[in-house]
């Protein structure tokens, strides 16, 4: 772990600031976690930090499609935090059952360690948001999860099938995984369905 510089700032709670800096420096590692999907231009794989930023932006852009009662500020914060656990747990490919089977355990252990780097009040707050996102029971969490599921679909369509083609994914597999989108946003769910239909016509799915 990278430790903060050994300097002292006057008029600041040094222990608290050190904990915050330690967390901030640790999350720099998110930039080196590569996801399976490519950038929309197909030039290289996306990393987790880019993914998290793009989803936070999407929450603002698509705010009008959020369910009633959703708090977009909370959704944005959720999306900034949601993949921090992958610093320890790594990226889990959505169409790899063997990876999925251990995902929850790996990510909970990562959340225990990483969020605990923060001062206690911030640790409780960030962990509660992450748990809420994972549980998907609130309008905020459902909308956040919908955006998280839509983004790789867009990347795959714009890279001529992307991971769908590379890993031999079927239409049925994609349709099952993206049901979550409609749960969080009727409009985005409708768009996702139309995108699947078009991707199918273009031959982006395995027939196996």
Which residue stretches match the model-derived regions?
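Alpha-helical, largely C-terminal catalytic domains
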Residues: 1-208
């Amino acid at each position: 772990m990278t430790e903060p510089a050994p300097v002292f700032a006057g008029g600041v709670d040094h222990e608290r600031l050190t904990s915050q800096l330690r967390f901030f420096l640790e999350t720099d590692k998110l930039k080196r976690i590569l996801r399976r999907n490519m950038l929309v231009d197909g030039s290289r794989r996306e990393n987790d930090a880019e993914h998290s930023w793009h989803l936070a932006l999407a929450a603002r852009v698509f705010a009008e499609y959020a369910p009633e009662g959703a708090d977009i500020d909370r959704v944005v914060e959720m999306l900034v935090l949601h993949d921090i656990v992958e610093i320890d747990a790594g990226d889990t490919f959505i169409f790899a059952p063997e990876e999925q089977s251990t995902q929850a355990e790996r990510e909970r252990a990562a959340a225990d360690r990483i969020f605990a780097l923060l001062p206690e009040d911030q640790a409780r707050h960030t962990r509660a948001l992450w748990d809420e996102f994972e549980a998907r029971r609130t309008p905020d969490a459902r909308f956040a999860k919908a955006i998280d599921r839509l983004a790789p679909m867009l990347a795959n369509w714009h890279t001529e099938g992307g991971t769908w083609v590379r890993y031999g994914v079927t239409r049925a597999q994609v349709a099952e995984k993206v049901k979550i989108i409609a749960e969080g946003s009727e409009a985005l769910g409708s768009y996702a369905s139309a995108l699947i239909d078009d991707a199918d016509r273009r031959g982006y799915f395995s027939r196996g």
